[in-house]
Amino acid sequence: MVFSVEVDEGINIPGISVSDIFRQTALDALRFTDCPYECEVSLTITDDDTIRTVNKEYRGIDKATDVLSFPFLEFKAPGDFSGVSELDPDSFNPDSGDLMLGDIMISADHVIAQAEEYGHSVKREFAFLIAHSMLHLQGFDHIKADEAAEMEKAQNEILERLGIRR
């Protein structure tokens, strides 16, 4: 598995190891869906100004957000890897052979503010956003009520298995 982390200059999420929590949560999200592949995911930690710019550019929404997910694959159903072809050169890194799932961008400003707002730890908020985004990279969504319920259940199970509670 390749999990790369880039933290923008001057950005910090105090009191946690971003790399460790990212790796643990991402691995558990992949276990949750029984992903049969070694995967590659990149994470960028940034601030509200930068994520707002990216959100406007890619989603047409001129507003800061907590997390953006950029999946590289389309799934028939959430977590269903049966449509992934090992023969598709665009799905796998030619150097490592890892399945390229996508990119995650998280606002450190939002992590800190939401942890305080929801009354839980920064670690819990960060792990939640990683779980949420990893599920998006595996085809989950929350546009419809039934999809949202399925995704929320998955997020909670991942965090529970990691022992991360409110």
Give short role names for the model-derived ranges:
Residues 130:
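A glycine-rich beta-strand to alpha-helix segment
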Residues 1-127, 137-166:
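An acidic/histidine-cluster motif and surrounding catalytic segment
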